[in-house]
C-alpha cells in the first residue's frame, strides 16, 4: 500500500498536474496497481462555507471546489487509469458524495460542492467507458462513503448531523470495492454498494 498527498515523497497536489504526473510515474515504477483510491474533497475552508442560497455564490469558492472535487480527480484518472493492468481485475475508486446526485437533491444549497461532485460523477462515468476499451475487467467508480467524521464534516457534526467513524467508512468502502465486477464500472454507489441516482 502506498499513500500519496501534498506532504509525501513524491508529493501529490491535485492543483498541480505536474505533481500528479510525477506521482503516477513513481507508482508506475513500482508495477501496475490493482487498486487506486482517490479520497480527496473540498467543501469549506479558507473563508468559504457551503452556500445556502444563490446570493451566497462566490466565483473563487466555486472555482476551488471544481478544481479539487472534479478537475483534480479527472487529472488523477488521466495519469493513473493507464497504469491499471490491461488484464485482470483492477479498480480506480474516487470519493464522491450523495449530494452530488442531481436526482436525489431534495434540499438545495451547497451549490459549489453539489455541482463539482456531480461533475466528478460524469467524469467517472465517461472515463469508465474509455477504460473498458483498454482494460475490460477494470472498474472505475464513484463512491459515497456516508458522512464521515473528518475535518470536512466537523462543522455539521457539531450541528447534530450523524457522522460515521472514518475506520468504519473505510472498511465499508473496501467491502464494496472487493465486490465490484466489470459490470459495475462507471457506477455511483453508496457505502453499502447500492446505486445512487445520477
Regions found by a protein language model. Name each.
Residues 76-80, 84, 123-124:
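Hydrophobic positions on the long internal alpha-helix
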Residues 138, 142, 150, 155-198:
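C-terminal helical subdomain
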Residues 5-22, 26-27:
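Rossmann-fold cofactor-recognition segment
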Residues 19, 64, 72-79:
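Conserved mid-core alpha-helix of short-chain dehydrogenase/reductase
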Residues 100-102, 123-159:
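Flexible, glycine-rich beta-alpha linker
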Amino acid at each position: 500500500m502506498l499513500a500519496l498527498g501534498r506532504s509525501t515523497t513524491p508529493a501529490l497536489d491535485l492543483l498541480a498536474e505536474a505533481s500528479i504526473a510525477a506521482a503516477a510515474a513513481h507508482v508506475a515504477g513500482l508495477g501496475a496497481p490493482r487498486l487506486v483510491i482517490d479520497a480527496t474533497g473540498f467543501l469549506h475552508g479558507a473563508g468559504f462555507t457551503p452556500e445556502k442560497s444563490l446570493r451566497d455564490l462566490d466565483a473563487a469558492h466555486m472555482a476551488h471546489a471544481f478544481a479539487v472535487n472534479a478537475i483534480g480527480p479527472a487529472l488523477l484518472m488521466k495519469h493513473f487509469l493507464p497504469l491499471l493492468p490491461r488484464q485482470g481485475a483492477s479498480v480506480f475508486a474516487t470519493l464522491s458524495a450523495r449530494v452530488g446526485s442531481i436526482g436525489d437533491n431534495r434540499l438545495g444549497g451547497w451549490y459549489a460542492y453539489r455541482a463539482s461532485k456531480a461533475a466528478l460523477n460524469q467524469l467517472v462515468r465517461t472515463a469508465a467507458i474509455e477504460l473498458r476499451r483498454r482494460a475490460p475487467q477494470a472498474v472505475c467508480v464513484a463512491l459515497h462513503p456516508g458522512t464521515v467524521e473528518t475535518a470536512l464534516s466537523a462543522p455539521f457534526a457539531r450541528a447534530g448531523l450523524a457522522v460515521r467513524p472514518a475506520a468504519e467508512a473505510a472498511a465499508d468502502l473496501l467491502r464494496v470495492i472487493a465486490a465490484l465486477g466489470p459490470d459495475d464500472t462507471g457506477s455511483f454507489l453508496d457505502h453499502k454498494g447500492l446505486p445512487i441516482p445520477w
